[in-house]
């Protein structure tokens, strides 16, 4: 598993993608709930 030179592990891609999606969805719903989502 140490031969990842030039290749990004799928687990890392999945983790980053998951965090990004959860963060964006969380911010979107939080903004909408706070009343600031209409400006987006």
From Swiss-Prot:
One of its GO terms (biological process) is photosynthesis. The chain crosses the membrane at residues 8-28. It comes from the Eukaryota. This is Photosystem II reaction center protein J. It is a single-pass membrane protein. PSII is composed of 1 copy each of membrane proteins PsbA, PsbB, PsbC, PsbD, PsbE, PsbF, PsbH, PsbI, PsbJ, PsbK, PsbL, PsbM, PsbT, PsbX, PsbY, PsbZ, Psb30/Ycf12, at least 3 peripheral proteins of the oxygen-evolving complex and a large number of cofactors. It forms dimeric complexes. Its main location: plastid. InterPro entries: PSII_PsbJ, PSII_PsbJ_sf. SUPFAM superfamilies: Photosystem II reaction center protein J, PsbJ. Belongs to the PsbJ family. GO terms for cellular component: chloroplast thylakoid membrane; photosystem II; photosystem II reaction center. One of the components of the core complex of photosystem II (PSII). PSII is a light-driven water:plastoquinone oxidoreductase that uses light energy to abstract electrons from H(2)O, generating O(2) and a proton gradient subsequently used for ATP formation. It consists of a core antenna complex that captures photons, and an electron transfer chain that converts photonic excitation into a charge separation. It is found in: Plastid, Chloroplast thylakoid membrane. Pfam families: PsbJ (PF01788). Keywords: Chloroplast, Membrane, Photosynthesis, Photosystem II, Plastid, Reaction center, Thylakoid, Transmembrane, Transmembrane helix. The keyword Amino-acid biosynthesis does not apply.
């Amino acid at each position: 598993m140490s031969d990842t030179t030039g290749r990004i592990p799928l687990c890392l891609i999945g983790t980053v993608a998951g965090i990004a999606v959860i963060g964006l969805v969380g911010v979107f719903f939080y903004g909408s709930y706070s009343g600031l989502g209409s400006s987006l």
